[in-house]
Amino acid sequence: MNNKFKDFFGFGDNDSYEERDAYEEHYDEQEEMQNSNRPTNSRDSNVVSIKAGQAGSGPSKIVLYEPRVYSDAKEVAQNLLNQRAIIINFSRMDDASARRVVDFITGTVYALNGEIQRIGDKIFLATPPKFETDGKITELLDKKDTLG
């Protein structure tokens, strides 16, 4: 009877507990091996977010835009959100308004992890994150006298 109390409170013979622990460890190892040998469902491994699928479903677009007022910046930002690159020509805006639009678009591009580059006099290229741009045309802008 004394042993039953010791066993109940954990002061008894530890051999039975060691055997139980060894059995549980062996069972866990077998279960883990069975799960790793189980074929993966191809449907589970090809999960793609809806937004990512929509962005790559059609051809990529580059939008040409000439804003005239500051409120046009919202439409430019919406195109960036829709994964479209935008070439923006500010030649029809005064410098102060153009600077405000560039600041707005720069904030949008930063939030999306995209890029904005000046590619000409009052012309900018804004791209969403999945676009990559290479090269520079500033050398041509410096030599514009030789082109005409």
Swiss-Prot record:
Record GO biological process:
division septum assembly; FtsZ-dependent cytokinesis
Asked if the record carries the keyword Cytoplasm, the reply is yes
- Indicate, by first and last residue, each region the UniProt record lists as having compositional bias (Polar residues): 33-48
Give the span(s) annotated as Disordered. Answer: 1-59
Entry keywords, A to Z = Cell cycle, Cell division, Cytoplasm, Septation
Say yes or no: keyword Cell cycle present.
yes
Q: Which compartments is it annotated to reside in?
A: Cytoplasm
Superkingdom of the source species: Bacteria
For this UniProt entry, what's an example GO CC term? cytoplasm
Coiled-coil spans are none
Q: Which cysteines are joined by disulfide bonds?
A: none
Q: Enumerate the Pfam families for this protein.
A: SepF
Subunit field text: Homodimer. Interacts with FtsZ.
Its function, per the record, reads: Cell division protein that is part of the divisome complex and is recruited early to the Z-ring. Probably stimulates Z-ring formation, perhaps through the cross-linking of FtsZ protofilaments. Its function overlaps with FtsA.
Protein name stated in the entry: Cell division protein SepF
